[in-house]
Amino acid sequence: MTEAMKITLSTQPADARWGEKATYSINNDGITLHLNGADDLGLIQRAARKIDGLGIKHVQLSGEDWDADRCWAFWQGYKAPKGTRKVEWPDLDDAQRQELDNRLMIIDWVRDTINAPAEELGPSQLAQRAVDLISNVAGDRVTYRITKGEDLRDQGYMGLHTVGRGSERSPVLLALDYNPTGDKEAPVYACLVGKGITFDSGGYSIKQTAFMDSMKSDMGGAATVTGALAFAITRGLNKRVKLFLCCADNLISGNAFKLGDIITYRNGKKVEVMNTDAEGRLVLADGLIDASAQKPELIIDAATLTGAAKTALGNDYHALFSFDDALAGRLLASAAQENEPFWRLPLAEFHRSQLPSNFAELNNTGSAAYPAGASTAAGFLSHFVENYQQGWLHIDCSATYRKAPVEQWSAGATGLGVRTIANLLTA
């Protein structure tokens, strides 16, 4: 085992020989990170990426200036999908160490799950991993039901069944109930709904290779809301919350759904399929119908839903949509407290009508006349939320995954969004 490289923090500028505005310097004792008070957490995260790039795989965070947030910023930049890294953490008080340990356990689970190859993480495996994580932190306060394959069709989950039937791996709906009250009749405070497309080829509206090569990550929304519930539980969540994960592959086969097919949902809505690569909204619709039936105060869905959100925000922000201004403000306040990037994009009544079909009530994709793809996707989902104008948040997870490394992140999943949603649930 190599000796750990000591990493210390300083508010003093680096020696001028390291260059103007140098953020780190190296001496016989190790590496010093020079904080300037402007974006200290970002500076630490970027420095950790550079340290990893130097091939340093064993570090000791040394000194009294480290706290849980600074340690976490370092780990966010230091962690990568290849190789092993060891961090010797500084002495923290019990509360901060517990917070850090919970982040390491749960958000690393989210990142590792999203990074997993589709071959090893199908719909059933994703659902079971979610059950295992929540059960690990909640124990007997959790019950769940898994519905799969033809049982989905028999029970009316036509969106999920339609999308997933083209794969040999059956589609799966996970319905998980976290009920810390012990009262089976306790009201449901919140419902979380996640898109769990474990691989998205685009179906017959097939993706090009450059757009398909990262589609193992199309279950990022499901992983994010699962992690958020687990993390909220570790922070003392004492209200009943239900989790719905809509898990499927979107593949091409003789049994796959086709353009022009019409899906009839349990709420009576008929949807014409004009793009099989707009499948996420089709599976989420089933989860949102179930969520609405619980009459919760709050519904949050999360999905890697549209390329349009990435076009608007890149991979730097999650896109937020809501008709409820007060609730959107609460989510953004939670994001600010957790230092996670969210940005609200437009969602108006007219977006709900920008999905015209000649054969059904709705089309599953907008036309060239209505190019606001992220907003029309949110508008589509609103048709499956009973009281869509209040208590509903839609998160288009554009910051979930990076195809290439940048100065703050390795390639792969980020885990962003988990803490924000957990913060909102426990506020």
From Swiss-Prot:
Cited Gene3D superfamilies: Zn peptidases (3.40.630.10)
Entry keyword annotation includes Hydrolase: yes
GO cellular component: cytoplasm
Binding site for Mn(2+) 2: 195, 200, 218, 279
Assigned EC number: 3.4.11.23
Cofactor note: Binds 2 manganese ions per subunit.
Single GO BP term: proteolysis
InterPro entries found in the cross-reference section: Leucine_aapep/pepB, M17_PepB-like_N, Pept_M17_PepB, Peptidase_M17_C
Subcellular location: Cytoplasm
Molecular function GO terms recorded: manganese ion binding; metalloaminopeptidase activity
Residues at the catalytic site: 207, 281
KW Transport (keyword) present: no
Catalysis: reaction(s): Release of an N-terminal amino acid, Xaa, from a peptide or arylamide. Xaa is preferably Glu or Asp but may be other amino acids, including Leu, Met, His, Cys and Gln
PROSITE patterns (UniProt xref): CYTOSOL_AP (PS00631)
Binding site for Mn(2+) 1: 200, 277, 279
Matching Pfam families: DUF3663, Peptidase_M17
Cofactor: Mn(2+)
Function: Probably plays an important role in intracellular peptide degradation.
Assembly description: Homohexamer.
Family: Belongs to the peptidase M17 family.
Protein name: Peptidase B
Gene: pepB
